């Protein structure tokens, strides 16, 4: 039997296999009907097919996927649906949205076009998918013929800037729609890698978790996502618990603030890993050429710890990376090389170096190694012989530890998230933490199932009420920003 990551994206002729029954199916049916009608209105023809990909909430394992470590997310029911058709007679990509906030974007049907990153447009995410798919097809020897036009209509209900991977849901559904309309269907693990590469076209050094869970998710299961190679292991969460997702209402624009936030941490981790390599015996030139992530030097760190009767890589961090921030000059002295050269003059990394005044290497490495351990602690707890009650308590503790590390060591929180996490904990959550890139977006709270009906009104009262009064959010939109979620299904293609 094929492994889950080795099967291709399922193709359905009805909505039930993905959206189930009852109110969720009703809502989905209405969305698809409206999407089809709008497509006809905008483009004067019917779509050939639809593709969908969900957002996700990361339960634990923040900012470690790009360091080569496993993460533990689940898909949520909110998704992006794309209707698409090929237009042989025109050489344009016309990308429209059901939401009037996003005006139609038009691009040439040219897979080699450059994306104008200085002029940030929502349609750029589709072009990431378009370029990435063509590059991948070419590398596989797939002949797509000369470029043709595409008409595209997007309906996304994953809140943007929320830490729930609206961008990955868009890029994944776009890639799958393009793939399907050209008559292909790759394995899920190939798509996970391909879509991760796609998002790098927009200047985000994505680690791959968001794309992997969006494509590989299964109803009823969280997934332990491993990398190199990408694979997913089902994780059945204990009975009696529910995850509540709450938006801080501070939007995180990952692609816009990347040089000072997200990509900055990627570079700091790279520098920390190279210095650890050198301190643990590698020649500077060898470390610079071979070491890319903290997982690359974990073996050396564990050997160092082993000589001291431990297996914890944090011992090496404490010994060899000072807690005070490093200057560029200090790092260059240790590594005997200029920083731009160390990062291979990569434009994304150079933008980070230009914006940075210092580098907190000790704190970033300490977060990554401790968070990687918490992910496996989470999975081991789920699979243990503890009672469901004891499991839930332990999972909550791990989530609380994770948030502290994200906030204090990785500094990817913000005042709104700190307040929201505190409100969750004070009103019955077993554990709560920021989820996603941070610097805004959402928190996820683990709550006993029978407490959810009291928990949600309490959080509304303590966190959202004053924001409704100030006009930050409308009362009728609250269900978009605060909701309980069970693990939902992954990517799909529909011929309806």
Swiss-Prot record:
InterPro entries: Galactokinase (IPR000705), Galactokinase_CS (IPR019741), GalKase_N (IPR019539), GHMP_kinase_C_dom (IPR013750), GHMP_kinase_C_sf (IPR036554), GHMP_kinase_N_dom (IPR006204), GHMP_knse_ATP-bd_CS (IPR006203), Mevalonate/galactokinase (IPR006206). It is an enzyme of class 2 (transferase). Disulfide bonds: none annotated. Its EC number is 2.7.1.6. It catalyses: alpha-D-galactose + ATP = alpha-D-galactose 1-phosphate + ADP + H(+). Changing residue 437 to S: Reduced phosphorylation activity. Alpha-D-galactose binds at residues 56, 62-63, 65, 210, 262. This is Galactokinase. It comes from Arabidopsis thaliana (Mouse-ear cress). The gene is GAL1.
